[in-house]
């Protein structure tokens, strides 16, 4: 008998035997088997069969438990294993006879249930009492099988295979579970046209990730439900197949193929009533092929696809289609391509407006129309690595989620007041132990203060709860209204006009009036509210900023003032280069005011001048101004790119070369942080081909890396530095205008015209004057003073000492760098020796003064170093 049992039948009989041992029963009865069938894992086929004859599962289980409890039990250490009772043998014999009658090769759990109903004695009576007679069960069993025979050891997993391995999208549309699909009429019409063909009626939707391929299929499901399709598709079921579920748990070779064959047979038996949908269609190529087998899912589908027996809609991305589907021409020719293009910003706004109600109901917040417009436009401009409408929908969803989190969290006023109350309570406990008069008086004052704050806290908390209730009330009403509209639509579709009229002319208008009243009440509360209840354009901009680091929101008053004073801020670090500071400041202001060219970098400059005059320092100061960190910039030393083959390191090695997967040093840095300062230092030392790469960046604000990805440079400030012609700038015999002209001539002879023509500005840094060196000396001294302050040392430097530093450190050919070295050697080195020797201790004041042609460094008490 074992050889004829299916896997689940064997498991059920073993479980029944174990139950008999546990209960101490000498006989294995049909009641044990019935309980095992009801309580086993993956027993949905048994429960579905009993549900089909409207039997009460709980009552059947209770009846079987009662029978088992009434059986005689045997105790002792030498109890023999339970033996099948006469009734049990009769049940198995009846099950075998029924299996033979139905032409089945294996004995399944359904056969055993039929045997219990027919020959199970008391257990059969329990089933009969619940309306599950052998005759009714056999009819339900035949209907569920659909004419298929049991020819494998796992037939139970094959019944209702389509239901098990698929999701009915038309049922979801009927229940209002799918989001509305706005637009995409042309794509849906093309899909319907292909599905209406006689053969090869299989459209495949191809497009970039996030453009709405799955939404097109959901739109088709909604049209089928509404009847807005040709006769050939009316009343059809659109089922999304889950290949992952088919593969999951397929332990043995051929198990996946068996499941897929069962699904395909069920689709074929439906006589064209089922249209299938496979998302990520490329997964069918290679799915299920194990070892040396060539029979993957794609090859199993081909015959039915070609004959028109299987109407299938696929969806995949352009890259996956090219890599997987096009490599199998026999599979490709069975599908008809439907290209789903990225919608425009205007179309995306329309889509967002259609989805707005769903997101408002889910998050229980209001979403302003300006937020939808901002989501579409800002995502299109700043999130270039993804596609509309998906990225815009994500922005709205996350902004609404943030606001909901803020609403559910305590407002700042309540939080601060609660902390204050907690502090006063702790203080009260501490002072309460004191008995002196001063402490008692302080305790009295503290308790009065605590009572006032607790009363204020109660008032604020009550107000906050009221505001939250008002917000939640509006959200709940919107959700209920959405649900009732769905019910009304279903009632109209099903011809239940009585229910539809009750909803449309009774409940829905009442609910709309309640919603209007609740919204008005909310507006009253909102005039002086503690919590914000509407997602606005600024919230969307905040999400964009958190994703990309790009400040896309409106300028706050403090930031406006900061930008207007940008020259002063940069001038605190960069001495004497007014033209360069103004050029960079103007570029940043254009960008933040929103009037910069959106298709070019924020600014691109070539800084020219002798060494040590502040070219690199200005780039650092700019990064510090924008990001509060001078290291927050992409700095590339172009002397490392002096050879032709090293150019590929900027954008990444081409395919087949070492480092292909790593990406380029320039492109990867900007891709990770699109709003940044890019400093290309000493560009004249780079190979000429580097400038050919930069042409695209300077003109269109984009660059394609070694892996074919387009990197967006439109939010970067590009700074290139060079020493070309610096010998003219330090020549004291020529005027300023002539110096600059000579430098520009050298630059024009060194760089191609098309490169120079794309730069926003060529900024010539002038040599530093004596006065400017004095100011730089003060900056260097201030830096040293800050480092000494960490050791609680105070540094005092006289004006005479500063003048000496400026004189001694003045070398026009080398700029301010000799001055930095002089401060380090003349002051820093001496201080280091004395600190280590203990001559200067923490808390001392150090004085630096000039004595003749020397610098005197010593404690303020007068001792020199």
Curated annotation (Swiss-Prot):
UniProt xrefs under PANTHER family: ATP-DEPENDENT CLP PROTEASE, HEAT SHOCK PROTEIN 104
Pfam families: AAA, AAA_2, AAA_lid_9, Clp_N, ClpB_D2-small
Ranges of residues in domain Clp R: 1-147
InterPro entries on file: AAA+_ATPase (IPR003593), ATPase_AAA_core (IPR003959), Chaperonin_ClpB (IPR017730), Clp_ATPase_C (IPR019489), Clp_N_dom_sf (IPR036628), Clp_R_dom (IPR004176), ClpA/B (IPR001270), ClpA/B_CS1 (IPR018368)
Keyword Protease: no
Binding site for ATP 2: 609-616
Region span, NBD1: 160-342
Residues involved in ATP 1 binding: 207-214
SS bond list: none
Gene: clpB
Region described as NBD2: spans on this chain: 559-767
Sorted UniProt keywords: ATP-binding, Chaperone, Coiled coil, Cytoplasm, Nucleotide-binding, Repeat, Stress response
Transmembrane segments: none
Region (C-terminal): 768-865
Full protein name: Chaperone protein ClpB
Function as written in the Swiss-Prot or TrEMBL entry: Part of a stress-induced multi-chaperone system, it is involved in the recovery of the cell from heat-induced damage, in cooperation with DnaK, DnaJ and GrpE. Acts before DnaK, in the processing of protein aggregates. Protein binding stimulates the ATPase activity; ATP hydrolysis unfolds the denatured protein aggregates, which probably helps expose new hydrophobic binding sites on the surface of ClpB-bound aggregates, contributing to the solubilization and refolding of denatured protein aggregates by DnaK.
Compartments it resides in: Cytoplasm
Similarity field: Belongs to the ClpA/ClpB family.
Single annotated GO MF: ATP hydrolysis activity
Domain writeup: The Clp repeat (R) domain probably functions as a substrate-discriminating domain, recruiting aggregated proteins to the ClpB hexamer and/or stabilizing bound proteins. The NBD2 domain is responsible for oligomerization, whereas the NBD1 domain stabilizes the hexamer probably in an ATP-dependent manner. The movement of the coiled-coil domain is essential for ClpB ability to rescue proteins from an aggregated state, probably by pulling apart large aggregated proteins, which are bound between the coiled-coils motifs of adjacent ClpB subunits in the functional hexamer.
């Amino acid at each position: 008998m074992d050889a004829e049992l299916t896997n689940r039948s064997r498991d059920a009989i073993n479980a029944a035997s174990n139950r008999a041992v546990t209960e101490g029963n000498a006989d294995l009865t049909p009641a044990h088997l019935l309980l095992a069938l009801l309580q086993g894992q993956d027993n949905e086929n048994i429960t579905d069969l009993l549900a089909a004859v409207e039997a009460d599962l709980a009552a059947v289980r209770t009846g079987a438990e009662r029978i088992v409890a009434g059986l005689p039990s045997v105790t002792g250490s030498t109890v023999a294993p339970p033996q099948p009772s006469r009734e049990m043998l009769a049940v198995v014999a009846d099950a075998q006879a029924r299996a033979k009658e139905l032409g089945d090769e294996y004995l399944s759990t359904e056969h055993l249930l039929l045997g219990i109903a027919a020959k199970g004695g008391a257990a059969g009576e329990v089933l009969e009492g619940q309306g599950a007679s052998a005759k009714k069960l056999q009819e339900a069993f035949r209907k569920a099988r659909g004419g298929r025979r049991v020819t494998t050891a796992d037939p139970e997993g094959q019944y209702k295979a389509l239901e098990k391995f698929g999701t009915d999208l038309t049922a979801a549309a009927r229940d209002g579970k799918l989001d509305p699909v706005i637009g995409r009429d042309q794509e849906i019409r093309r899909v319907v046209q292909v599905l209406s063909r006689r053969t090869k009626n299989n459209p495949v939707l191809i497009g970039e990730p996030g453009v709405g391929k799955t939404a097109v299929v959901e739109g088709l499901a909604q049209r089928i439900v509404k009847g807005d399709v040709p006769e050939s598709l009316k009343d059809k079921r659109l089922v999304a197949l889950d290949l992952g579920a088919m593969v999951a748990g397929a332990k043995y070779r051929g198990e996946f193929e068996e499941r897929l064959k069962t699904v395909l047979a069920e689709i074929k038996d439906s006589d064209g009533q089922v249209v299938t949908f496979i998302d990520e269609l490329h997964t069918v190529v290679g799915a299920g092929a194990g070892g040396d087998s060539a029979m993957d899912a794609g090859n199993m589908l081909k015959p039915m696809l070609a004959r028109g027996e299987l109407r299938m809609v696929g969806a995949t991305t352009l890259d996956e289609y090219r890599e997987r589907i096009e490599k199998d021409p026999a599979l490709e020719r069975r599908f008809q391509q439907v290209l789903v293009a990225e919608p425009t910003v205007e179309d995306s706004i329309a889509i967002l407006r259609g989805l707005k109600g769903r997101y408002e109901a889910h998050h229980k917040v209001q979403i302003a129309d300006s937020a939808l417009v901002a989501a579409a436009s800002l995502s299109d401009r700043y999130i270039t690595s993804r596609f509309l409408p998906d990225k815009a929908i994500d922005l709205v969803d996350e902004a609404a989620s943030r606001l909901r989190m803020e609403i559910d969290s305590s407002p700042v006023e309540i939080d601060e007041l609660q902390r204050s109350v907690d502090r006063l309570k702790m203080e009260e406990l501490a002072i309460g132990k004191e008995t002196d008069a001063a402490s008692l008086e302080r305790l009295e004052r503290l308790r009065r203060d605590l009572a006032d704050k607790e009363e204020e806290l109660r008032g604020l908390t009550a107000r906050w709860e009221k505001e939250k209730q008002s917000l939640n009330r509006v959200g709940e009403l919107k959700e209920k209204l959405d649900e009732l509209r769905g019910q009304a639509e279903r009632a109209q579709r099903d011809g239940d006009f009585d229910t539809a009229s009750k909803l449309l002319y009774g409940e829905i208008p009442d609910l709309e009036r309640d919603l209007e009243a609740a919204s008005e009440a909310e507006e009253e509360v909102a005039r002086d509210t503690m919590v914000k209840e509407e997602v606005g354009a600024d919230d969307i901009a905040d999400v964009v900023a958190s994703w990309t680091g790009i400040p896309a929101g409106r300028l706050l008053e403090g930031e406006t003032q900061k930008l207007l004073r940008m020259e002063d801020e940069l001038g605190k670090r960069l001495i004497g280069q007014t033209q360069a500071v103004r050029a960079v400041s103007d570029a940043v202001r254009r960008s933040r005011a929103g009037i910069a060219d959106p298709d070019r970098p924020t600014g691109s400059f070539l800084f020219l001048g002798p060494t040590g005059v502040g070219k690199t320092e200005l780039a650092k100061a700019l990064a510090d101004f924008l990001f509060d960190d001078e290291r927050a910039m992409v700095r590339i030393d172009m002397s490392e790119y002096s050879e032709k083959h090293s150019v590929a390191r900027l954008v990444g090695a081409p395919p087949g070369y070492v480092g292909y997967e790593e990406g380029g040093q320039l492109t990867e840095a900007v891709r990770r942080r699109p709003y940044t300062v890019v400093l290309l230092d000493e560009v004249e030392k780079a190979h000429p081909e580097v400038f050919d790469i930069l042409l695209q960046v300077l003109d269109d604000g984009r660059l394609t890396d070694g892996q074919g990805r387009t990197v967006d440079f439109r939010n970067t400030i590009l700074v290139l530095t060079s020493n070309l012609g610096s010998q003219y700038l330090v020549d004291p015999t020529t005027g300023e205008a002539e110096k600059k002209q000579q430098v520009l001539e050298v630059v024009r002879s060194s760089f191609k015209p098309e490169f120079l023509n794309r730069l926003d500005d060529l900024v010539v840094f002038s040599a530093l004057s004596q006065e400017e060196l004095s100011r730089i000396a003060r900056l260097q001294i201030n830096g040293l003073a800050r480092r000494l302050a960490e050791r609680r040392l105070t540094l005092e430097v006289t004006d005479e000492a500063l003048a000496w530093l400026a004189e001694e450190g003045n070398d026009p050919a080398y700029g301010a760098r000799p001055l930095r070295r002089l401060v380090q050697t003349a002051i820093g080195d001496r201080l280091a020796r004395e600190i280590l020797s203990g001559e200067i201790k923490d808390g001392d004041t150090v004085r630096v003064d000039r004595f003749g042609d020397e610098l005197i460094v010593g404690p303020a008490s007068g001792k020199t170093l």
